[in-house]
Regions:
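Non-heme Fe(II)/2-oxoglutarate
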Residues: 2-96, 101-113
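Catalytic core of non-heme Fe(II) oxygenases with the double-stranded beta-helix
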Residues: 100-166
């Protein structure tokens, strides 16, 4: 992360006040680097576990996850702060997190993730690399949705099976 133990790093956080507590942060380059380096070592094919129409979706090994957790932990702390603000209430007991799944999607043109849900209490998405042509295409998009390469979050009171894969 950083070489200096006491060095404070400023992280900009955007919050979205609807449904669940949703935040947006930009991760540090060293975290991004370790995620990419470890993803290149992935051998487990995750396609059978995921909703994506993506040719390459791979799971991180336990060894890789052990390397990644120290980089991820500070962001869980940031989320905790935001969640307490969102609830307008301090935790009675600080939550403990278990990383039950971690994978990387290597998404190419014309591949996509359809609407789907994730199990567990907390879920996150990290964009490790966005091609410049896609950034340009998104910037030029005139519609009302998130546009090319964007991400959309849906929330509702219905059960998990409200998303159909038929």
């Amino acid at each position: 992360m950083t070489d200096k133990k006491d060095e404070k790093v400023k992280v900009e956080v955007a919050t979205y006040n609807w449904g669940p507590c949703l935040i947006k942060v930009k991760i540090l380059d060293d975290f991004k680097k370790v995620l990419l380096e470890e993803a290149k070592k992935n051998e487990e094919d995750y396609r059978g576990k995921l909703a994506g129409q993506i040719r390459k979706e791979t799971g991180y090994s336990d060894k890789s996850r052990d390397k990644i957790i120290p980089y991820l932990s500070p962001y869980l702390g940031i989320y905790d702060q935001c969640f307490q603000r969102y609830q307008n209430k301090k935790y009675d007991k600080k939550p403990e997190y278990a990383l039950t799944a971690l994978w990387c999607n290597f998404q190419r043109p014309n591949e996509f993730n359809p609407p789907h849900d994730h199990d567990g209490k907390l879920s996150f998405v990290i964009y490790l690399s966005i091609p410049d042509p896609l950034k340009k295409e998104n910037a030029e998009y005139k519609g009302r949705s998130c546009g090319p390469g964007g991400i959309q979050f849906m929330w509702g009171e219905g059960p998990r099976d409200c998303v159909s894969y038929q």
